[in-house]
Amino acid sequence: MRILCLDIGNSRVGVAISDPLKITAQPVMTIELRNKDLFEELDKIFQGYNIEKVVIGYPLSKLHPDQKDEKLKKIDEISEKIGSRYNVEIVKWDERFSTKAVERVIDEELNWKRKKKIIDKVAAVYILQGYLDFYNGS
């Protein structure tokens, strides 16, 4: 059984998956939302892997706890659909600063277009690895 991670953005979704022992996270893909349907792509992923849980990168807001911005509402809506469609546990994991941390690590030599594709899936790896480390008590 594996854990899938999604880093949901406005135009792209970074996807990462754990190894079967749930120790390490690997990048899977970046889904370009303007060109592809998120759930068609997720259907393929769920068919290819035995997934028991989905970790969703959740940008904990600086707003009052009772307030949610549009991005959080979108993530909540997608999370609910994923949970019911695939009958999996959903875990929302703090992803604040994950993209910024990954941007610092990625080689500055990459052109911006290539960098954007890599950043999203590597951000998903960063989020999932943080969750796996917590999950495994590391």
Swiss-Prot record:
Q: Which SMART domains match?
A: YqgFc
A GO biological-process term: rRNA 5'-end processing
Keyword terms, alphabetized: Cytoplasm, Hydrolase, Nuclease, Ribosome biogenesis
Superkingdom, taxonomy of origin: Bacteria
Which GO molecular function terms does the record list?
nuclease activity
InterPro entries referenced in this protein's UniProt entry, alphabetically: RNaseH-like_sf (IPR012337), YqgF (IPR005227), YqgF/RNaseH-like_dom (IPR006641), YqgF/RNaseH-like_dom_sf (IPR037027)
Coiled-coil intervals:
none
EC id: 3.1.-.-
Its annotated compartments are: Cytoplasm
Q: Which GO terms describe its cellular component?
A: cytosol
By its UniProt entry, which Pfam families does this protein fall under? RuvX
Any idea what job this protein has?
Could be a nuclease involved in processing of the 5'-end of pre-16S rRNA.
Q: Which family would the database say this protein is a member of?
A: Belongs to the YqgF nuclease family.
- The identity of this protein, by name, is Putative pre-16S rRNA nuclease
Source organism: Caldicellulosiruptor bescii (strain ATCC BAA-1888 / DSM 6725 / KCTC 15123 / Z-1320)
